[in-house]
Amino acid sequence: MRILVFDTETTGLPKERNPSIYKTEQWPHVIQLSYVVYDSELNEVVVLVNDYINIAFNTQISKESQEVHKITREMLNEGITINEALHKFNEYSKHCDLVVGHNVSFDKRMIIVEGVRNKIKIRFW
């Protein structure tokens, strides 16, 4: 069995409680996407990824979020595009049987929102 353990860090929280994933303007942006794919039958890590996302200069990061994750604009400037990160995530996640994470419902929605925002179909089981 392949297990995906993933986490996101974002620019903040949604502007309203439980907005539609299609109201992307209500949602923050993903600035870090980290995940591990583990094969339980082989007892090995298939891949370990920690991508910082190079967001637009005018995209604000809330002070509260920055205090939690400590991600700086300089770190993001060295990052990859959200498109690259999502395509890579899709490639690895499509072979997984189980998804695990802390606050995984929020993280799943964040990935889906970024997919909607960037016109990329996200594969979630």
Task: Give the location of each predicted region.
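Conserved non-catalytic scaffold segment of RNase H-like nuclease domains
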Residues: 1-117, 123-124
